[in-house]
């Protein structure tokens, strides 16, 4: 976000603007992108205490991801964190803790945790213990699959080669799955 003067690669960055000021300035291009059909929004590690009520990075904040992006702005696409190996995260959280916090906050994807195995184990344990529900993971997967397949299905429900735009050959029967929200047909998965 433009008003942050610090670099989250190097440490914590804080926005001191009020929530109303952020809505009137920094959020305008994000809202325009969402309205234009952006498939993915990356949430950075900047802290916005006047928006969230504390110094939690936006990428780990349910106030930002769930309440603002998904609730107030009505965004239902993929939310991905900025790289989790940045100092704004690694100086304050271990990889497992940060990954769990991001998913609990509403992120669908965790980008580049400092320690992938620790992040994976943290999430796995959180799901096993009921800290993160399987339904939440499944909803994130639905968002990801919807985007993944959206650009691969033509209006007739045929799988299309992403590079040429031509119908892709499908060998064998494969497995059938739904094409995606608002589209009819099946896709071959393999």
Report each predicted region and the residues it spans.
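Flexible, glycine/charged-enriched surface loops at secondary-structure junctions
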Residues: 132-138, 153-159
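Structural signature of the thiamine diphosphate
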Residues: 142-156
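Second-shell residues forming the walls of enzyme active-site clefts
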Residues: 1-136, 143
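Ser/Thr/Gly/Pro-rich low-complexity, disordered linker/stalk segments of secreted
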Residues: 158-190
């Amino acid at each position: 976000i433009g008003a942050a003067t610090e670099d989250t690669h190097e440490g914590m960055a804080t926005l001191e603007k009020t929530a109303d000021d952020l809505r009137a300035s920094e959020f305008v291009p994000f809202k325009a992108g969402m309205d234009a059909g952006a498939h993915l929004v990356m949430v950075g590690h900047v802290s916005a205490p006047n928006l969230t009520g504390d110094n939690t990075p936006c990428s780990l904040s349910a106030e930002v991801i769930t309440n603002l992006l998904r609730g107030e702005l009505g965004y239902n696409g993929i939310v991905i964190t900025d790289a989790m190996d940045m100092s704004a995260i690694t100086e304050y959280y271990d990889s497992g803790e940060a990954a769990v916090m991001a998913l609990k906050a509403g992120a669908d994807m965790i980008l580049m945790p400092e320690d992938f195995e620790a992040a994976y184990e943290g999430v796995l344990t959180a799901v096993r213990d009921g800290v993160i529900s399987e339904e939440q993971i499944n909803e994130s997967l639905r968002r990801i699959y919807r985007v993944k397949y959206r650009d691969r299905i033509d209006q007739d429900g045929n799988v299309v080669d992403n590079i040429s735009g031509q119908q892709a050959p499908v060998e064998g029967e494969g497995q059938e799955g739904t094409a995606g929200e608002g589209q009819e047909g099946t896709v071959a998965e393999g």
